[in-house]
From Swiss-Prot:
Binding site for ATP: 16-17, 265, 313, 317, 414
Biological processes annotated in GO: glycerol catabolic process; glycerol metabolic process; glycerol-3-phosphate metabolic process
A Pfam short name: FGGY_N
Pathway(s) of this molecule: Polyol metabolism; glycerol degradation via glycerol kinase pathway; sn-glycerol 3-phosphate from glycerol: step 1/1
PANTHER family: GLYCEROL KINASE, SUGAR KINASE
Protein name listed in UniProt: Glycerol kinase
Membership in a protein family: Belongs to the FGGY kinase family.
Top-level enzyme category: transferase
Biological role stated in the UniProt entry: Key enzyme in the regulation of glycerol uptake and metabolism. Catalyzes the phosphorylation of glycerol to yield sn-glycerol 3-phosphate.
Record keywords, A-Z: ATP-binding, Glycerol metabolism, Kinase, Nucleotide-binding, Transferase
EC nos: 2.7.1.30
Substrates-to-products reaction catalysed: glycerol + ATP = sn-glycerol 3-phosphate + ADP + H(+)
Length: 500
């Protein structure tokens, strides 16, 4: 990799459970970082909100702390890359700069009734055709509609709407830039996948005024500069990506046949499909990977197929914080290895309904097969197995949708630290699972994109080729049992569908 400049790249990763800042040097290495956990607000069952002001304050804190930890001056930062939890959205007053309500998080299911209305009115196929998405409360459109209905007595001329990237960009630039990128806009259920613009017919269906929405820009490119009152420097913001697209970029999955799975709060398996929109007959969604304008200002669009599984790492968090079965996430690996099998117990991780390939907003979580001989270790093992089984279903759907089957799964995210889970994943898939040394691929992708966009680095291929592999998990002797148990797990899932 030819290093074309000195200095640093600041990458912000604003996720579901916390907000992080990383400083990368010109060799593509992390020199400092900072993290702040984000408060989760559950006003009702099935509802989840974040305080957008808290996200902004935490963003400021992690930026400044990472810069101090790196012992550098803000003026040495060549560019900022931003990656965010997708779909989560809010409205704010552009005069006061204050949110009008807490942000509604992607996992929130309050708009399921509105989604059912859209389906009953026959809009599902139209929405899928235009956006590549299924009608689901997961996406931003119905959340924005709910906010517009709930918040009364405001002058819409003063209201701005956006996902978390738009909110933070607006704040970083001192209220000067109201924009988003194609990867985040493609998750709103309001952007036309072919044109890359807000779709007038969908805005009409959902009665969302176009003027409150941000301008859509290429993922790699200049979005603006930081207000000097923040860091005493006007730093260019040159990349914005949804978190899963950032991980795809960080792994070097930039062409058809390459895919990755991120095990975070949910699990997200994304396959790059090149410049073509691939439509799945197996309940996968078509989305944008990332976009970039060429020298002639033509926008090059990369598309992707995605299977979104809403609950994976969140299950482990629930074992710890909800039912207090474990004290740390790391314990799950030890406990799962303490028993020979799952003891006949199967878990369905449908805390927020089920995503791909079911898209059932009314499914709910459950343990099946509990007997008097079941130990806590069996419950923990069943949860880990369920995470892997969800991924298997999506891999099967991707294999059925693409011309050539997946040969290898590249992984990242917090739960991929779990060796039991990764080995079980290889066993059920029957293919190798590749875990890189750098687990924070999402933030790495944001940094790479920002640095490449500003000319800080000159070769994407060289950056990606630096990736180091920590371990490859090969399918083992557990494959046969894992495959047999998968059929029983699917039976458990069927029992959980349409529960409420």
């Amino acid at each position: 990799m030819q290093i074309s400049s000195s200095g640093y790249i600041l990458a912000l990763d604003l996720g579901t459970t916390g907000n992080r800042a990383f400083i990368f040097n010109n060799a593509g290495k992390i020199v400092a970082q900072a993290y702040k956990e984000l408060t989760q607000h559950y006003p009702q069952p099935g509802w989840l909100e974040h305080d957008a002001e808290e996200i902004w304050q935490d963003t400021c804190w992690v930026m400044k702390t990472a810069i101090v930890n790196a012992q550098i001056s803000p003026s040495e930062i060549a560019a900022i890359g931003l990656t965010v939890q997708r779909e989560t959205c809010l409205l704010w007053d552009k005069t006061t700069g204050r949110p009008l309500h807490k942000a509604i998080v992607w996992q929130d299911r309050r708009t399921a009734p509105l989604c059912h209305q859209l389906q009953e009115k026959g809009y599902a196929q139209e929405i899928y055709s235009r956006t590549g998405l299924v009608v689901d409360a997961y996406f931003s459109a119905t959340k924005l509609r709910w906010l517009l209905d709930y918040i009364t007595g405001v002058d819409l001329k003063n209201v701005l709407a956006g996902t978390i990237d738009t909110w933070i960009l607006w704040k970083l630039t001192g209220g000067k830039v109201h924009a988003t990128d194609h990867s985040n806009a493609s998750r709103t259920m309001l952007m036309n996948l072919k044109t890359g613009e807000w779709d007038e017919q969908l805005l009409e269906i959902l009665q969302i005024p176009a003027h409150i929405l941000p301008q859509i820009q290429p993922s790699l490119g200049k979005f603006g500069v930081t207000d000097t009152s923040l860091l005493d420097a006007a730093i260019p913001i040159t990349a914005i990506l949804g978190d899963q697209q950032a991980a795809l970029f960080g792994h070097g999955c930039d062409r058809p046949g390459l895919m990755k799975c991120t095990y975070g709060t949910g699990s997200f398996l994304v396959a790059h499909t090149g410049s073509n929109i691939v439509r799945s007959q197996h309940q996968l969604i078509s989305t944008i990977a990332w976009t970039q304008a060429d020298k002639q200002e033509n926008i090059n669009i990369g598309y992707a197929l995605e299977g979104s599984m809403f609950t994976s790492g969140a299950c482990i968090q629930w074992l710890r914080d909800g039912i207090k079965l474990i004290k740390t996430a790391a314990e799950t690996e030890t406990m799962a290895n303490q028993v020979a099998d799952n003891g006949g117990v199967y878990f369905v991780p449908a805390f927020s309904g089920l995503g791909a390939p079911y898209w059932d907003m009314n499914a709910r979580g459950a343990f099946f097969g509990i007997t008097a001989s079941v130990q806590p270790q069996h419950l923990v093992r069943a949860v880990l197995e369920a995470i892997a089984y969800q991924v298997l279903e999506v891999v099967q759907a991707i294999n059925a949708s693409c011309s050539s089957p997946m040969q290898r799964l590249i992984v990242d995210g917090g739960a991929c630290e779990n060796n039991f889970l990764m080995q079980f994943q290889a066993d059920v898939l029957g293919i190798p699972v590749e875990r890189p040394t750098m687990r924070d691929t999402t933030v790495q992708g944001a940094a790479f994109a920002a640095g490449l966009a500003v000319g800080f680095w000159d070769s994407y291929t060289a950056l990606v080729n630096q990736r180091q592999i920590d371990r490859i998990f090969e399918p083992g002797e557990g494959s046969q049992n894992a495959t047999a148990n998968f059929a029983i797990w699917q039976k458990a899932v069927k029992r959980s569908l349409d529960w409420v």
